[in-house]
Regions:
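Conserved interdomain linker/interface between the two RecA-like ATPase lobes of SF2 helicase motors
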Residues: 105-195
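Conserved RecA-like ASCE P-loop NTPase motor core of nucleic-acid helicases/translocases
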Residues: 12-20, 42, 189-195
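Conserved motor-coupling elements within RecA-like helicase/translocase cores
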Residues: 29-66, 77-80
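SF2 helicase catalytic motif II
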Residues: 57-119
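Conserved Walker A/P-loop ATP-binding site and its immediately adjacent core
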Residues: 7-33, 50
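Glycine-centered short loops/turns at secondary-structure junctions
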Residues: 11-12, 61, 115, 187
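Flexible beta-alpha connector loops of hexameric P-loop NTPases
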Residues: 39-48, 90-101, 162-170
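Motif I (Walker A/P-loop) of helicase-class P-loop NTPases
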Residues: 1-5, 107
Length: 195
């Protein structure tokens, strides 16, 4: 929000991409509270006439922030300064219908045209984005503490190939088995999310 506020102060506009239309209302509410009626939405729930009106408002500079899924990238802003892609790892950013495109790659190209910046936000970045950050193509910013002040969890990376070479044929690494056993011995619960 701070970066968007800075762009607006410079007379530039921002696009905020969200992966699901269902997230539009809660996201719009947060932005509307901060930026007022110069925030709008662009998504498939709008009629063709409403989409046209939003595009005309954007071209006329009456909108500072547009919120929506990947199609919001095509909003014709006169002075786009920032594209924020929330949860950039989500598959919904990939268009499966013609024309096929990935919103991340499209956002980068649109940003080049306008001289704009792109922020890819994610607690679990895609491998592509993380790889590019590791190569220095993107700048990686990491949260070192939570907004609420709580501690960040400890993360372990385990090479299951090495575990297999050492005779562990389980789908669980020895480290995970150790941590689950520890929690269960303390009377605590463990939840496994399988992707």
């Amino acid at each position: 929000m701070r970066l968007i506020g800075e762009m607006i102060a410079r007379g530039r506009q921002a696009i905020v991409l969200i992966p699901e239309i269902a997230l539009t209302y809660q996201t719009l509410l947060r932005f509307y509270q901060r930026f007022g009626d110069r925030v709008s939405v662009m998504n498939s729930t709008l009629s063709p006439g409403e989409k046209y009106d939003q595009c005309e408002r954007a071209k006329a500079g009456e909108i500072d922030v547009i919120i929506g899924p990947r199609s919001a990238l095509f909003t014709p802003f006169p002075s786009l300064g920032l594209i924020v892609m929330d949860e950039e790892q989500e598959n919904s950013y990939k268009s499966e219908s013609t024309p096929k495109y990935h919103a991340r790659e499209t956002a980068l190209e649109v940003a080049k045209l306008y001289g704009a910046s792109v922020v890819l936000g994610s607690a679990t970045p895609s491998l592509e984005a993380y790889y590019r950050a590791g190569r220095g193509e993107y700048r990686l910013l990491q949260l070192t503490k939570r907004l609420t002040g709580g501690e960040l969890p400890t993360v372990y990376t385990v090479d299951l190939r090495q575990e297999l070479q050492e005779g562990n044929r389980s789908i669980f690494s020895r480290k995970l088995q150790e941590l689950m056993t520890d929690r269960l011995n303390k009377g605590q619960q463990t939840i496994l999310f399988l992707n």
